[in-house]
Regions:
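Acidic, small-residue rich beta-repeat scaffolds with periodic aromatic anchors
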Residues: 2-112
Length: 112
């Protein structure tokens, strides 16, 4: 239930902030069902528009970043990287592996 929760990002990758009585803290991981739905939507988006993404590679990479960031919040990074490896080109998988630390740093996320 998102009552009383301030969402700083209503689209993936979400960062949901909750007031703990003194300050707002990141409570994104408290909403796994919402994150699972975001992950599912990212996968569907990536699968549904292959020709579009061939022309707009930056948008493709942005959606991959969203999917990876969401998977990290769900502690499913390995599963998502395996998904990328089996469903996309080797170049895409190599890009994801190469960029994972940058993605983590830019989004303020850490591997668990």
């Amino acid at each position: 239930d998102l009552i009383g929760v301030c969402s700083t990002c209503t689209r993936p990758p979400r960062k949901i902030m909750c007031f703990d009585g003194q300050s707002y803290v990141d409570c994104t991981k408290r909403f796994p069902e919402l994150l699972k739905e975001d992950l599912k939507e990212s996968r569907e988006t990536l699968r549904s528009r292959p020709e579009y993404f061939k022309e707009y590679v930056d948008l493709f990479h942005t959606e991959l970043i969203f999917m990876i960031a969401t998977s990290i919040n769900l502690n499913q990074e390995k599963e998502t990287l395996n998904y990328i490896r089996t469903n996309f080109s080797k170049d895409t998988y190599d890009w994801a592996i190469e960029k994972i630390d940058v993605i983590l740093k830019e989004l303020g996320l850490q591997k668990v």
